[in-house]
From Swiss-Prot:
HAMAP family: UPF0367. It comes from the Bacteria. It comes from Synechococcus sp. (strain JA-2-3B'a(2-13)). InterPro entries: UPF0367 (IPR020885). This is UPF0367 protein CYB_2632. The lineage of its organism: Bacteria, Bacillati, Cyanobacteriota, Cyanophyceae, Synechococcales. Residues 69-89 are annotated as: Disordered. Belongs to the UPF0367 family.
Length: 89
């Protein structure tokens, strides 16, 4: 199972879309990245394989996307996969 997390401007909770196949997840990820790089807002519809739910959004409200693979093992100490930003003062 692959998870795409879409980060929206001004919203702390990501929109999560699950894909069963790696190829489908990569296609969805690449379409999101291409839409973000185009610079002009576009409409985007994604379907979640886990629940069959759909989401429709404008890419102008997106500020990032992350794709992760869910393995059978739990993350150490309850941490999620992702990136850690170090802010310098």
């Amino acid at each position: 199972m692959y998870t795409l997390e879409l980060l929206l401007k001004g919203n702390p909770a990501p929109i999560v879309v699950h894909q069963k196949e790696e190829e489908a997840a990569n296609r969805a990820y690449q379409s999101i990245v291409n839409a973000l790089q185009s610079g002009s807002p576009q409409s985007l519809e994604l379907t979640c394989d886990r629940t069959g739910k759909k989401v429709f959004l404008l890419t102008g409200e997106l500020c990032g996307v992350q794709m992760t693979s869910k393995s059978g093992s739990a993350s150490p100490m309850g941490t999620r996969p992702g990136f850690l930003a170090q802010l310098q003062s």
